[in-house]
From Swiss-Prot:
GO cellular component assignments: cytosol; small ribosomal subunit
Gene source species: Listeria welshimeri serovar 6b (strain ATCC 35897 / DSM 20650 / CCUG 15529 / CIP 8149 / NCTC 11857 / SLCC 5334 / V8)
SUPFAM superfamilies (UniProt xref): S13-like H2TH domain
Lineage of the organism: Bacteria, Bacillati, Bacillota, Bacilli, Bacillales
Cited function: Located at the top of the head of the 30S subunit, it contacts several helices of the 16S rRNA. In the 70S ribosome it contacts the 23S rRNA (bridge B1a) and protein L5 of the 50S subunit (bridge B1b), connecting the 2 subunits; these bridges are implicated in subunit movement. Contacts the tRNAs in the A and P-sites.
UniProt KW Protease keyword: no
HAMAP family, sorted: Ribosomal_uS13
Domain of life: Bacteria
InterPro entries registered for this protein in UniProt: Rbsml_uS13_C, Ribosomal_uS13, Ribosomal_uS13-like_H2TH, Ribosomal_uS13_bac-type, Ribosomal_uS13_CS
Record's protein name: Small ribosomal subunit protein uS13
Matching PROSITE patterns: RIBOSOMAL_S13_1, RIBOSOMAL_S13_2
Skewed-composition ranges (Basic residues): 106-121
Region (Disordered): 91-121
Assigned protein family: Belongs to the universal ribosomal protein uS13 family.
C-alpha cells in the first residue's frame, strides 16, 4: 500500500479511487489533484512512480485533509455550541441541525427510541 497524507491507499485500485480513501478528498478533488500532477486517472496505484507519488503528496500538503480537517470541523461545532446559536443547541441535544422534521424520523441522529410508559386505565 502506498502511504499518502498519512493514509494507506489501496494498491490495486485506480489512483482516482484510491485517493478518496483520504478524509476530505472526494472524486472531484481527486481528479483535480491528478490533473495538476499530470497523472492519468486510469493508472493503478501500484504503477505510480516515486516521482508521481511525490507530486501528489506535494499537492495534497496544500489541501486541508485528515486530522487538520477533522480538527477544524470539531472546532467549528464547538464554537457554535459556545456562542449559544440555534445550530449549537441542536448539536448539543443531538438533534438534526439543518431544519429536518423530527416528529417521525431522525432516528439516525436521535438514536434508538426510548419507550415511554403509557397511561394506565
Amino acid at each position: 500500500m502506498a502511504r499518502i497524507a498519512g493514509v494507506d491507499v489501496p494498491r490495486e485500485k485506480r489512483i482516482v479511487i484510491s485517493l478518496t480513501y483520504i478524509y476530505g478528498i472526494g472524486k472531484q478533488t481527486a481528479s483535480e489533484v491528478l490533473a495538476e500532477a499530470g497523472v492519468s486517472e486510469d493508472t493503478r496505484t501500484r504503477d505510480l512512480t516515486e516521482e508521481e507519488l511525490g507530486k501528489i503528496r506535494e499537492i495534497l500538503d496544500r489541501i486541508k485533509v485528515e486530522g487538520d480537517l477533522r480538527r477544524e470541523v470539531n472546532l467549528n461545532i464547538k464554537r457554535l455550541i459556545e456562542i449559544g446559536s440555534y445550530r449549537g443547541m441542536r448539536h448539543r441535544r443531538g438533534l438534526p441541525v439543518r431544519g429536518q422534521n423530527t416528529k417521525n424520523n431522525a432516528r439516525t441522529r436521535k438514536g434508538p427510541s426510548k419507550t415511554v410508559a403509557g397511561k394506565k386505565k
